[in-house]
Amino acid sequence: MKILSTIWATLSDLFYNSVFQVNLEFGEDDMCGVLGLVSHEPVNQLLYDGLQMLQHRGQDAAGIVTAEGSTFHMHKGKGMVREVFRTRNMRDLIGNAGIAHVRYPTAGNAGSSAEAQPFYVSSPFGIVLAHNGNLTNTAELYENVCNKHLRHVNTSSDSEVLLNVFAHELRREVSKNANPHRLNIDNIFNAVAEVHRLVRGAYGVVAMIAGYGMLAFRDPYGIRPLVLGSQTDEAGRKSYAVASESVAFNALAYDLERDIQPGEAVFVGFDGTLIARQCSDRAKLSPCLFEYV
Protein backbone atom coordinates (compact mmCIF):
# COMPACT_ATOMS: atom_id res chain seq x y z
CA MET A 1 0.00 0.00 0.00
CA LYS A 2 2.86 2.36 0.83
CA ILE A 3 4.40 1.73 -2.60
CA LEU A 4 1.06 2.38 -4.32
CA SER A 5 0.59 5.59 -2.34
CA THR A 6 4.05 6.77 -3.35
CA ILE A 7 3.38 5.99 -7.03
CA TRP A 8 0.03 7.82 -6.90
CA ALA A 9 1.60 10.86 -5.24
CA THR A 10 4.36 10.95 -7.84
CA LEU A 11 1.93 10.65 -10.74
CA SER A 12 -0.28 13.34 -9.24
CA ASP A 13 2.67 15.71 -8.90
CA LEU A 14 3.80 15.04 -12.46
CA PHE A 15 0.28 15.59 -13.81
CA TYR A 16 -0.20 18.81 -11.91
CA ASN A 17 3.19 20.20 -12.83
CA SER A 18 2.80 19.38 -16.53
CA VAL A 19 -0.75 20.61 -16.97
CA PHE A 20 -1.12 23.30 -14.35
CA GLN A 21 2.30 24.96 -14.17
CA VAL A 22 1.41 28.58 -13.42
CA ASN A 23 2.96 31.99 -13.03
CA LEU A 24 2.41 32.78 -9.35
CA GLU A 25 2.35 36.52 -10.06
CA PHE A 26 -1.23 35.90 -11.12
CA GLY A 27 -4.10 34.41 -9.13
CA GLU A 28 -5.15 31.06 -10.46
CA ASP A 29 -8.69 29.79 -9.86
CA ASP A 30 -8.13 26.03 -9.96
CA MET A 31 -11.36 24.25 -9.00
CA CYS A 32 -14.19 26.78 -9.08
CA GLY A 33 -17.84 26.48 -10.07
CA VAL A 34 -19.64 28.27 -12.90
CA LEU A 35 -23.32 28.44 -13.80
CA GLY A 36 -25.27 30.19 -16.54
CA LEU A 37 -28.98 30.44 -17.35
CA VAL A 38 -31.18 31.79 -20.13
CA SER A 39 -34.82 31.50 -19.13
CA HIS A 40 -38.29 32.95 -19.66
CA GLU A 41 -38.60 33.88 -16.00
CA PRO A 42 -36.43 35.67 -13.43
CA VAL A 43 -33.25 33.71 -12.77
CA ASN A 44 -31.91 35.31 -9.58
CA GLN A 45 -33.24 32.62 -7.24
CA LEU A 46 -32.34 29.84 -9.67
CA LEU A 47 -28.75 31.06 -9.84
CA TYR A 48 -28.58 31.26 -6.06
CA ASP A 49 -29.95 27.73 -5.65
CA GLY A 50 -27.62 26.38 -8.33
CA LEU A 51 -24.60 28.02 -6.69
CA GLN A 52 -25.54 26.39 -3.41
CA MET A 53 -25.27 23.02 -5.16
CA LEU A 54 -21.82 24.01 -6.46
CA GLN A 55 -20.60 25.38 -3.13
CA HIS A 56 -18.22 22.43 -2.68
CA ARG A 57 -16.24 23.73 -5.67
CA GLY A 58 -15.43 27.03 -3.96
CA GLN A 59 -16.01 28.62 -0.57
CA ASP A 60 -13.84 31.75 -0.80
CA ALA A 61 -16.09 34.07 -2.85
CA ALA A 62 -19.28 34.11 -4.91
CA GLY A 63 -20.86 36.31 -7.56
CA ILE A 64 -23.95 36.64 -9.74
CA VAL A 65 -24.63 38.84 -12.78
CA THR A 66 -28.08 39.04 -14.36
CA ALA A 67 -29.08 40.58 -17.68
CA GLU A 68 -32.13 42.81 -18.03
CA GLY A 69 -32.20 43.64 -21.72
CA SER A 70 -28.81 45.25 -22.37
CA THR A 71 -28.28 46.13 -18.69
CA PHE A 72 -26.21 44.00 -16.33
CA HIS A 73 -26.89 43.77 -12.58
CA MET A 74 -24.00 42.42 -10.49
CA HIS A 75 -23.32 41.48 -6.91
CA LYS A 76 -20.26 39.58 -5.68
CA GLY A 77 -18.09 39.32 -2.61
CA LYS A 78 -16.07 37.16 -0.26
CA GLY A 79 -17.64 34.30 1.61
CA MET A 80 -20.06 31.44 1.15
CA VAL A 81 -23.08 31.88 -1.11
CA ARG A 82 -25.45 32.39 1.83
CA GLU A 83 -23.11 35.05 3.28
CA VAL A 84 -22.63 37.04 0.08
CA PHE A 85 -26.28 37.26 -1.02
CA ARG A 86 -28.85 38.88 1.24
CA THR A 87 -32.48 39.62 0.37
CA ARG A 88 -31.69 43.19 -0.69
CA ASN A 89 -28.97 41.92 -3.04
CA MET A 90 -31.25 39.33 -4.59
CA ARG A 91 -33.97 41.92 -5.28
CA ASP A 92 -31.51 43.93 -7.35
CA LEU A 93 -30.55 40.98 -9.57
CA ILE A 94 -33.24 41.52 -12.18
CA GLY A 95 -33.49 39.65 -15.47
CA ASN A 96 -34.26 36.37 -17.21
CA ALA A 97 -30.62 35.47 -17.88
CA GLY A 98 -27.50 35.38 -15.76
CA ILE A 99 -24.18 33.80 -14.89
CA ALA A 100 -22.69 32.94 -11.51
CA HIS A 101 -19.44 31.78 -9.93
CA VAL A 102 -18.01 30.32 -6.73
CA ARG A 103 -14.27 30.63 -6.20
CA TYR A 104 -11.70 28.28 -4.75
CA PRO A 105 -8.33 30.05 -5.06
CA THR A 106 -5.06 28.16 -5.20
CA ALA A 107 -2.48 30.94 -5.50
CA GLY A 108 -2.16 34.69 -5.35
CA ASN A 109 -5.77 35.75 -4.86
CA ALA A 110 -6.83 34.21 -1.55
CA GLY A 111 -8.58 36.81 0.55
CA SER A 112 -9.10 39.35 -2.25
CA SER A 113 -12.71 40.48 -2.76
CA ALA A 114 -11.66 42.44 -5.86
CA GLU A 115 -10.99 39.17 -7.63
CA ALA A 116 -14.41 37.66 -7.01
CA GLN A 117 -16.06 36.73 -10.29
CA PRO A 118 -17.72 37.35 -12.71
CA PHE A 119 -15.55 40.06 -14.30
CA TYR A 120 -16.86 42.83 -16.58
CA VAL A 121 -15.54 44.85 -19.52
CA SER A 122 -17.49 47.58 -21.28
CA SER A 123 -16.11 47.04 -24.79
CA PRO A 124 -17.16 45.62 -27.11
CA PHE A 125 -20.89 45.72 -26.30
CA GLY A 126 -20.41 44.89 -22.60
CA ILE A 127 -19.23 41.42 -21.57
CA VAL A 128 -19.26 39.56 -18.25
CA LEU A 129 -17.33 36.34 -17.79
CA ALA A 130 -16.78 33.63 -15.18
CA HIS A 131 -14.05 31.03 -15.49
CA ASN A 132 -13.18 27.70 -13.91
CA GLY A 133 -9.60 26.56 -14.43
CA ASN A 134 -6.17 28.09 -14.70
CA LEU A 135 -4.05 29.41 -17.55
CA THR A 136 -0.41 28.48 -18.05
CA ASN A 137 0.68 31.41 -20.26
CA THR A 138 -0.95 34.24 -18.30
CA ALA A 139 2.16 36.44 -18.27
CA GLU A 140 2.42 36.34 -22.07
CA LEU A 141 -1.30 37.04 -22.48
CA TYR A 142 -1.13 39.91 -19.99
CA GLU A 143 1.75 41.48 -21.93
CA ASN A 144 -0.24 41.34 -25.18
CA VAL A 145 -3.50 42.52 -23.65
CA CYS A 146 -2.08 45.47 -21.72
CA ASN A 147 0.96 46.64 -23.66
CA LYS A 148 0.05 45.69 -27.22
CA HIS A 149 -3.74 46.02 -27.25
CA LEU A 150 -3.87 48.78 -24.60
CA ARG A 151 -6.55 47.12 -22.50
CA HIS A 152 -6.70 47.46 -18.72
CA VAL A 153 -6.51 44.53 -16.30
CA ASN A 154 -7.37 45.64 -12.78
CA THR A 155 -6.52 42.50 -10.78
CA SER A 156 -4.00 39.67 -10.74
CA SER A 157 -6.63 37.12 -11.79
CA ASP A 158 -5.97 35.06 -14.90
CA SER A 159 -9.74 35.07 -15.44
CA GLU A 160 -9.73 38.83 -16.04
CA VAL A 161 -6.87 38.36 -18.50
CA LEU A 162 -8.91 35.67 -20.29
CA LEU A 163 -11.91 38.01 -20.49
CA ASN A 164 -9.78 40.72 -22.08
CA VAL A 165 -8.29 38.30 -24.59
CA PHE A 166 -11.80 37.27 -25.66
CA ALA A 167 -13.02 40.88 -25.72
CA HIS A 168 -10.13 41.98 -27.93
CA GLU A 169 -10.66 39.11 -30.37
CA LEU A 170 -14.40 39.79 -30.51
CA ARG A 171 -13.75 43.48 -31.23
CA ARG A 172 -11.35 42.50 -34.01
CA GLU A 173 -13.91 40.14 -35.56
CA VAL A 174 -16.72 42.69 -35.42
CA SER A 175 -14.54 45.33 -37.09
CA LYS A 176 -14.53 43.16 -40.24
CA ASN A 177 -18.32 43.36 -40.59
CA ALA A 178 -20.06 45.58 -43.15
CA ASN A 179 -21.78 47.07 -40.11
CA PRO A 180 -19.06 47.09 -37.42
CA HIS A 181 -21.61 48.04 -34.77
CA ARG A 182 -23.55 44.79 -34.98
CA LEU A 183 -22.54 41.35 -33.77
CA ASN A 184 -23.21 38.08 -35.61
CA ILE A 185 -22.78 34.47 -34.57
CA ASP A 186 -19.68 33.95 -36.72
CA ASN A 187 -17.98 36.82 -34.89
CA ILE A 188 -18.56 35.06 -31.58
CA PHE A 189 -17.35 31.63 -32.65
CA ASN A 190 -14.35 33.05 -34.52
CA ALA A 191 -13.36 34.95 -31.37
CA VAL A 192 -13.58 31.73 -29.35
CA ALA A 193 -11.42 29.98 -31.96
CA GLU A 194 -8.78 32.69 -31.49
CA VAL A 195 -8.96 32.23 -27.72
CA HIS A 196 -8.27 28.53 -28.24
CA ARG A 197 -5.30 29.40 -30.45
CA LEU A 198 -3.79 31.91 -28.02
CA VAL A 199 -4.59 30.59 -24.56
CA ARG A 200 -2.90 27.65 -22.87
CA GLY A 201 -4.27 25.82 -19.86
CA ALA A 202 -7.62 24.81 -18.45
CA TYR A 203 -10.80 26.83 -18.85
CA GLY A 204 -14.51 26.21 -18.63
CA VAL A 205 -16.18 29.56 -19.32
CA VAL A 206 -19.62 31.11 -19.10
CA ALA A 207 -20.12 34.66 -20.33
CA MET A 208 -22.84 37.07 -21.42
CA ILE A 209 -22.73 39.70 -24.15
CA ALA A 210 -25.06 42.61 -23.38
CA GLY A 211 -28.12 42.63 -25.61
CA TYR A 212 -27.22 39.35 -27.31
CA GLY A 213 -27.00 36.25 -25.14
CA MET A 214 -25.00 33.75 -23.11
CA LEU A 215 -21.84 32.04 -24.31
CA ALA A 216 -20.17 28.94 -22.89
CA PHE A 217 -16.96 27.34 -24.09
CA ARG A 218 -14.46 24.70 -22.98
CA ASP A 219 -10.73 24.42 -23.61
CA PRO A 220 -9.64 22.09 -26.46
CA TYR A 221 -8.59 19.35 -24.04
CA GLY A 222 -11.71 19.46 -21.89
CA ILE A 223 -9.56 19.70 -18.77
CA ARG A 224 -12.36 21.31 -16.79
CA PRO A 225 -15.96 20.04 -17.05
CA LEU A 226 -18.89 21.93 -18.54
CA VAL A 227 -22.38 20.50 -19.03
CA LEU A 228 -25.54 21.66 -20.80
CA GLY A 229 -29.04 21.33 -19.38
CA SER A 230 -32.53 22.41 -20.36
CA GLN A 231 -36.12 22.75 -19.21
CA THR A 232 -39.33 23.04 -21.23
CA ASP A 233 -42.24 24.93 -19.69
CA GLU A 234 -45.97 24.31 -20.14
CA ALA A 235 -46.06 26.69 -23.10
CA GLY A 236 -43.38 24.64 -24.87
CA ARG A 237 -40.68 27.27 -24.37
CA LYS A 238 -37.19 25.95 -23.72
CA SER A 239 -34.74 27.39 -21.19
CA TYR A 240 -31.06 26.48 -21.06
CA ALA A 241 -28.44 26.12 -18.34
CA VAL A 242 -24.69 25.55 -18.35
CA ALA A 243 -22.77 24.42 -15.26
CA SER A 244 -19.51 22.93 -14.04
CA GLU A 245 -21.45 19.94 -12.73
CA SER A 246 -24.89 18.53 -13.47
CA VAL A 247 -25.64 18.49 -9.73
CA ALA A 248 -26.52 22.19 -10.12
CA PHE A 249 -29.45 21.19 -12.35
CA ASN A 250 -31.03 19.23 -9.50
CA ALA A 251 -31.92 22.47 -7.72
CA LEU A 252 -33.32 24.00 -10.92
CA ALA A 253 -35.47 21.08 -12.12
CA TYR A 254 -33.46 21.13 -15.35
CA ASP A 255 -32.57 18.01 -17.32
CA LEU A 256 -29.01 17.17 -18.28
CA GLU A 257 -28.68 17.22 -22.06
CA ARG A 258 -24.98 16.51 -22.60
CA ASP A 259 -21.40 17.51 -21.94
CA ILE A 260 -20.09 20.50 -23.81
CA GLN A 261 -17.29 18.99 -25.85
CA PRO A 262 -13.60 19.97 -25.66
CA GLY A 263 -13.09 23.00 -27.90
CA GLU A 264 -16.83 23.49 -28.37
CA ALA A 265 -18.72 26.75 -27.87
CA VAL A 266 -22.45 27.05 -27.17
CA PHE A 267 -24.31 30.33 -27.62
CA VAL A 268 -27.84 30.85 -26.32
CA GLY A 269 -29.51 34.05 -27.48
CA PHE A 270 -31.69 35.93 -25.05
CA ASP A 271 -34.60 34.79 -27.26
CA GLY A 272 -33.79 31.18 -26.33
CA THR A 273 -32.15 30.14 -29.62
CA LEU A 274 -29.20 27.77 -29.12
CA ILE A 275 -26.31 27.40 -31.57
CA ALA A 276 -23.26 25.18 -30.97
CA ARG A 277 -20.02 24.93 -32.93
CA GLN A 278 -16.67 23.19 -32.61
CA CYS A 279 -14.09 25.99 -32.48
CA SER A 280 -10.83 24.05 -32.27
CA ASP A 281 -9.04 21.81 -34.76
CA ARG A 282 -7.02 20.16 -31.98
CA ALA A 283 -9.81 19.07 -29.65
CA LYS A 284 -9.00 15.95 -27.63
CA LEU A 285 -10.54 14.97 -24.31
CA SER A 286 -7.93 14.94 -21.52
CA PRO A 287 -9.90 15.74 -18.35
CA CYS A 288 -8.34 16.64 -15.03
CA LEU A 289 -7.98 13.53 -12.86
CA PHE A 290 -8.84 15.51 -9.74
CA GLU A 291 -12.38 16.12 -11.05
CA TYR A 292 -13.03 12.42 -10.39
CA VAL A 293 -11.66 12.31 -6.85
Model-identified regions with their sequence ranges:
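Conserved short alpha-helical segments that host acidic/polar catalytic motifs at enzyme active sites
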Residues: 7, 11, 15, 20-293
